[in-house]
Amino acid sequence: MQIRRKHPNPAVKVESLSYVVKVPEAQPQNILEEIVWHKEIEVDKLRERLPLLELRQKIANTAPPCDFLAALKQGKTQPALIAEVKKASPSKGVILEDFDPVAIARTYEQGGATCLSVLTDSKFFQGSYENLTLVRQAVSLPLLCKEFILYPYQIYYARSKGADAVLLIAAILSDQDLAYFVKIVKGLGMTALVEVHSLAEFDRVLAIEGIELIGINNRNLETFTVDLDNTRQLLEARGEQVREKGILIVSESGLHTATDLAKVKQAGANAVLIGESLVKLPDPALGIQKLFENLG
C-alpha cells in the first residue's frame, strides 16, 4: 500500500469564509499514514520557528557527531545492541509511566549497549527532541534519532539536538528522496539507518548507492503487528547481496528473549534494536547482561 503524503483535504476559502469539505480520501488509510500526515503539519510549524539557514549555522558551531556505524561494527555485544529510550507507542500505549530518559539511557550504557535510540515523535510515541538533547548530555554512546523523517530539514534539526544517526523509513520516502537524504546525512558526518519491512522495500534500498546500514523492521507499520520471522525471510532472499555490498543489518521490533536474539543473529543480523522489553525492566542494565550472556 502506498503511503500518501500531504493531507488531500485543504481548506476552501470563499471571500471571508473558510471551510473544509470532508471526502473519503481525506481519512488516513492506516496508522503510518496518520503519523505522516501529522508530521507534515508539525514540520511546517517547526520551520516557521527556526528557518533552515539559522539551523545550519547552529550546527556549524557544534562538535562533530560520533561514528554510529563504526560503533556497531565494533559492537560491545554480538549482535550489537541499540537500546531504545521509549515511553509509549501507538500499539502498546504508555509502556512506562515513571519515565526518566536520562536514567534509562545511563542504565543502558552501564549494561553494555553499543548505541542508543531516542524516540522524538511527541503525538504518537510521547517522545521529544528535549529527551534527545538530555540523553546526549548524559551519555557518551552514539545516538539515533528515531523519527518519521519526510524532509531534509528534520535531518539538520536532529543533528542540532545531538543525533549522530537518523532513521529513514523506506515506506514513506521515494527512492529519489532516500538517495538524497543519505547524501545529506553523510555530509553532516552522520549515519543513516534505512528501514525496510517488505522484500520490495529491501530491493529498492539495495539498489541505492551509499547505503551502509539497513534496519529490517519485524513490525508492519501499517498494522503495527509483529512477525519476528521477517528478518530471516528477507535475509534468506537477499543476504548474498547484503554481504557483497558490506551492508550491516539491524533487526528491529519484537525482540524480547535470548532465543529471539539468537534467531536473528543466525539469520545474519549484525545488530538489534530493542526498546519495550528493556524499558519495562526494573534493572535494564542487568536485563541487557542476561539477554546477551550466552550469545557470545
Curated annotation (Swiss-Prot):
Pfam families with a match to the protein in the record: IGPS (PF00218)
Catalytic activity: 1-(2-carboxyphenylamino)-1-deoxy-D-ribulose 5-phosphate + H(+) = (1S,2R)-1-C-(indol-3-yl)glycerol 3-phosphate + CO2 + H2O
Record key words, sorted: Amino-acid biosynthesis, Aromatic amino acid biosynthesis, Decarboxylase, Lyase, Tryptophan biosynthesis
Organism domain of life: Bacteria
UniProt cross-references to InterPro entries, sorted A to Z: Aldolase_TIM (IPR013785), Indole-3-glycerol_P_synth (IPR045186), Indole-3-glycerol_P_synth_dom (IPR013798), Indole-3-GlycerolPSynthase_CS (IPR001468), RibuloseP-bd_barrel (IPR011060)
PROSITE patterns assigned: IGPS
TM helices/strands, residue ranges: none
Gene3D superfamilies reported for this sequence: Aldolase class I
GO BP terms, alphabetized: L-tryptophan biosynthetic process
UniProt pathway annotation: Amino-acid biosynthesis; L-tryptophan biosynthesis; L-tryptophan from chorismate: step 4/5
SUPFAM superfamilies: Ribulose-phoshate binding barrel (SSF51366)
Listed EC numbers: 4.1.1.48
GO molecular function, one term: indole-3-glycerol-phosphate synthase activity
Family named by the database record: Belongs to the TrpC family.
PANTHER family attached to this UniProt entry: INDOLE-3-GLYCEROL-PHOSPHATE SYNTHASE, TRYPTOPHAN BIOSYNTHESIS PROTEIN
Protein name, per record: Indole-3-glycerol phosphate synthase
Organism name: Microcystis aeruginosa (strain NIES-843 / IAM M-2473)
